[in-house]
Curated annotation (Swiss-Prot):
UniProt entry keywords in alphabetical sequence: Acyltransferase, Cell membrane, Lipid biosynthesis, Lipid metabolism, Membrane, Phospholipid biosynthesis, Phospholipid metabolism, Transferase
Region (Disordered): 104-135
Underlying gene: plsB
Compartment(s): Cell membrane
PANTHER family reported in the protein's UniProt record: DIHYDROXYACETONE PHOSPHATE ACYLTRANSFERASE (PTHR12563:SF17), GLYCEROL-3-PHOSPHATE ACYLTRANSFERASE (PTHR12563)
Protein name as annotated: Glycerol-3-phosphate acyltransferase
Enzyme Commission (EC) number: 2.3.1.15
GO molecular function, one term: glycerol-3-phosphate O-acyltransferase activity
Primary localization: membrane
Family, per entry: Belongs to the GPAT/DAPAT family.
Amino acid sequence: MTKPVADTSAVLTSEDTLVLASMGSPVEMQLIMDWLGEQRARTPGAKFDVLKLPPRNAPTAALTALVEQLESGSEAGADRSIVPVQVFWQPPADRSRLAKVAGLLPGRDPYHPNPRQQRRILRSDPQRARVMAGESATVSELRKQWRDNTVGEDQHDFAHFVARRAILALARAEYRILGPQYKSPRLVKPEMLASARFRAGLEKIPGATVEEAGKMLDELATGWSQASVDVFSVLGRLISRGFDPEFDYDEYQVAAMRTALEAHPAVLLFSHRSYIDGAVVPVAMQDNRLPPVHMFGGVNLSFGVMGPLMRRAGMIFIRRNIAGDPLYKYVLKEYVGYVVEKRFNLSWSIEGTRSRTGKMLPPKLGLMSYVADAYLDGRSDDILLQGVSICFDQLHEIAEYAAYARGAEKTPEGFSWLYNFIKAQGERNYGKIYVRFPEAVSMRQYLGVPHGPITHDLAAKRLALQKMSFEVAWRILRATPMTATGLVCALLLTARGTALTLGQLHHTLQDSLDYLERKQTPMSTSALRLRSREGVRAAVDALSNAHPVTRVDSGREPVWYIAPEDELAAAFYRNSVIHAFLETSIVELALAHARHAEGDRMAAFWDQVMRLRDLLKFDFYFADSAAFRANIAEEMAWHRDWESQVAAGGDQIDAILYAKRPLISDAMLRVFFEAYAIVADVLRDAPANIKQKDLTDLALGLGRQYVAQARVRSSEPVSTLLFATARQVVDDQHLIEPAPDLTERRSAFLAELRNILRDFDYVGKIARNRFVARELKARQERLEQQAQ
């Protein structure tokens, strides 16, 4: 038989060694015995015993031989070395996608070939067979670990423990060969159920049993396999096949994250705009040969063949509504702690669900609290919260989001849904997927040392969790590149259905690009190309055919506009870039407010800045108050002597607004205040404690009336998604609960919102005047050129 390649680590050095050999076929047995013969020849005086490694669920009787070996030699045998070995079968290099999918079929797993395939491999490609040894340990070391960490009572329990340790050591040796992207926890259920720590906590839960806890661990377990990891990466590429095949990364960020992950376990918290995100993160880790993530997902996604496949690729499905199930909460908490302790990485959406508006939702803290508990309990000296920004040039799901905003029901997940979802990805090209990894947040920095004072201070811990989560979200936003899609849609939405020429689009976009460059905002390739007319043409053409732009090219030159029925879809893209213009938009509105204020206009300016921040806090992320004020001052510092101009008011403030580039608040923020105003108008004659559904239904009805009467600029603010946030705003203003002056305060709030909308009108008028003046100048220049 042709000899296999021996792993350099597969050398026995101890004088007394028990080899636990994982041998699943006569071929593997022969390979290992040949290898053992080489070891004996290398060290003639050493004692090498070999025993077949018991399977993971071996009955007690199958452990008798191992028990005898562990007990042999009494005290002298305590320092006997235990070395696990197995034959590792290297998959063929450069396998096709079809071959990877075929690896799931019975008898086709390249990592575990059947005996016939093994013999063929040794004849044709013996380099693919490798005798691999796991890390060794002495009997005394293993016995101490067993006594310290488990509830085992007899020698058969100890033998079970040794067998599990051998399997885990072989798994570690295997992923060192394959690469970190195949790293995954093994034997989680038996390890946890045997843990003294786990059993002690279980005893504190009334009625809890080991059997029931075991069933819950089966539900959480990933059932990981190498072939499933390969297939899931193929599935990820299939789901995202409508995009460019290569994801767009920042290589410096990838290198920094690789270094960080070598030191500490991490939770990868990704922004969530599409179901594709769940496939993007694992593929991104594989692309960059980074350790895999074990992603939490709702049990609603565990359907058909997808459930088992995703489990084996590292997906952890969790139940919903677990507040009334203390045993499940405990098992989930301990499961998270175990995975973190073993230095595996977790992942989920920081927003908890897809953002159907395009802007980032507030972070959810549920799972984060379990990770914090694991850290505070000393499971790791630090845990990194690694943000992941995922953005797209385009998404096919925006049509669904627009329908949902109008009141449609969510489509339930299932096999037919998945088929249609994957099918839709091939309908056209959606551009690029951009993946960014901003600097990670240290849990230790916010929670202090493990077992520290914050451990038992629930209020302090929750506050720290909120600060951590918001910091991660803030870093995600700052790392998210601007896309041409978002910038173009923002511009066309302000035109309110009026078509623009290529020249108008190109010229108007330059102010925004100048601002983003000045602020050193990350830019996508598509956004950078907007500097040229060709880049603008490529961007609007990609969005044409109502995706969501309409092109008219039957005249002298093509023009582009957004039809009323496509405004909600376009708003999704516009909303994805608002965060970059949020502070400068607030500056414009505060200037318009101060322009018409009496008395101290500087005070009026700053008061309105902070008031607008307070009203928008449920829709957008802001820096803390001090940093926010500093950012606003920095925005104004671009205008010389701005404070005296604001204090003077009138024409002096107008001069600032006319000089400001870009003038963009009307494009970015108006729709949110229109939605707030619709809800506030509904509240004028609504009862106290009105239910959210009733408020939304009334707002949809009144909003449609507003659209028909042209009391709002478009149909965009008539959205269940925006009304949900508006409900939070009015609740924060204490306009829902009963009070003696409720009617007066509701009317006052509506009046305040209408004043803000008048400020939008004022800024918008200046922006339009400037646009018209520029167009007239450009036309005059063209006429002069023609006359020459």
